[in-house]
UniProtKB/Swiss-Prot annotation:
Pfam families (UniProt xref): URO-D (PF01208)
UniProt-annotated binding residues for substrate: R36, Q37, A38, G39, R40, D85, Y160, S215, H334
GO molecular function: uroporphyrinogen decarboxylase activity
Pathway: Porphyrin-containing compound metabolism; protoporphyrin-IX biosynthesis; coproporphyrinogen-III from 5-aminolevulinate: step 4/4
EC class (word): lyase
Protein family according to the UniProt entry: Belongs to the uroporphyrinogen decarboxylase family.
Annotated HAMAP family: URO_D
Any one biological process term the GO annotation gives: protoporphyrinogen IX biosynthetic process
InterPro entries in the cross-refs: UROD/MetE-like_sf (IPR038071), Uroporphyrinogen_deCO2ase_HemE (IPR006361), Uroporphyrinogen_deCOase (IPR000257)
Entries under PANTHER family matching the protein: METHYLTETRAHYDROFOLATE:HOMOCYSTEINE METHYLTRANSFERASE RELATED, UROPORPHYRINOGEN DECARBOXYLASE
Catalytic activity: uroporphyrinogen III + 4 H(+) = coproporphyrinogen III + 4 CO2
Protein name, UniProt field: Uroporphyrinogen decarboxylase
The organism of origin for this protein: Rhodococcus erythropolis (strain PR4 / NBRC 100887)
Length: 355
């Protein structure tokens, strides 16, 4: 386990609203940021990414810095999130994969056996040195705005490696999980090592919080999540605890898993739009902050609807705090959709800050 001394270069941001809300202190304003806030919804992003592949972009420190900064400048959000992708550490380690436009990550040689797991390359920090350099650039550029680092959770990474790409039903993943638990746990153990290395690299470079994305965990029953996934996510959170920064845990469609996801060790639990925040607070239990949970599609519905729904989410966040949550960070229930009008995002941020 990495000691706290290795994280000593981090900025001190005592007044950052996001960090206050995440740790049970009273923020100076209601903090808000959006998953995928740096991306295709911004014309400046589309311009700077023209002709440059996604993975190539993720390994260019100056480009990562600029893309990460774009929504902070435009929207006045309370955090930047590192521009990257959950498969970046897999690519860096040497796994043969690519991000195909309109499809997503595609893996050349899907995992099928314990021998395949044993052959997986292990990430070392030097292979993600470009990401660490981008973090260092950003901590200089951001001033008093926190930087959130992130990684994919072992289960979601495993799903890509077993399926060979995105999957609606995750049938190959679940088949391996149930039919060959030994291989499954070996795979998730290996991926947990990769995730820990990637997060620790970002933390040592200076990120102020981290988010673990378990994008596909909602495909699982609670019993399967507890048996096959929770121990590995729990180890990830434990191994980065010494950094002393807020740890956020998020998945889509995880309303029935929220209690278990909270048990994994995060300080903040992300909630998608399918469950009210005050209900989520009861499932997560006291002592955690909540993050969420405006439906991303609401941003297409016009100013009156956005105004109403933002106010509703903020009120539910307040009730969640009354129900035992230690704070609320306003966010979407998933990522910003590519065709979202950026002015709708800016307006939503202004409204959140006024409440």
């Amino acid at each position: 386990m990495t000691g706290s001394a290795e994280y000593s270069a981090r900025r001190v941001l005592p007044d950052a609203p996001l960090l206050a809300a995440a740790t049970g202190r009273t923020p100076s304003r209601r903090p808000v940021w959006f998953m995928r806030q740096a991306g295709r919804s911004l014309p400046e992003y589309r311009e700077i990414r023209a002709g440059i592949g996604m993975l190539e972009s993720c390994f260019d420190p100056a480009l990562v810095c600029e893309i990460t900064m774009q929504p902070v400048r435009r929207h006045d959000v309370d955090a930047a999130i590192l521009f990257s992708d959950i498969v970046v550490p897999l690519k860096a380690a040497g796994i043969d994969l690519d991000i195909v436009a309109g499809v997503g990550p595609v893996v050349a040689n899907p995992i099928r056996s314990i021998a395949d797991v044993a052959a997986l390359p292990r990430l070392v920090p030097e292979e993600v040195g470009a990401i660490a350099q981008a973090v260092r650039l950003l901590t200089t550029e951001l001033g008093s705005t926190p930087l959130i680092g992130f990684a994919g959770a072992p289960f979601t990474l495993a799903s890509y490696l077993v399926e060979g790409g995105p999957s609606r039903n995750h049938e190959k993943t679940k088949a391996l999980m149930h039919s060959d638990p030994k291989t499954w746990h070996a795979l998730l153990g290996s991926l947990a090592d990769t995730t820990i290395c990637f997060l620790q690299t970002q933390l040592k470079a200076g990120v102020d919080a981290v988010q673990l994305f378990d994008s596909w965990a909602g495909a699982l029953s609670l019993a399967d999540y507890r048996e096959f996934v929770l121990p590995h996510s729990e180890r990830v959170f434990a191994e980065v605890a010494a950094a002393g920064v807020p740890r956020i845990h998020f998945g889509v469609g995880t309303g029935e898993l929220l209690g278990a996801m909270g048990e994994a060790g995060a300080d903040v639990v992300g909630v998608d739009w399918r469950i009210p925040l005050d209900v989520a607070a009861g499932r997560v239990g006291p002592g955690k902050a909540l993050q969420g949970n405006l439906d991303p599609a609401v941003l297409f519905a016009g100013p009156e609807v956005i105004d109403r729904e933002v106010r509703r989410i903020a009120a539910e966040g307040d009730r969640a705090i009354e129900a035992g949550a230690i704070g609320h960070i306003f966010n979407l229930g998933h990522g910003v959709l590519p065709d979202t009008d950026p002015t709708a995002i800016t307006s939503a941020v202004e409204l959140v800050h006024s409440l």
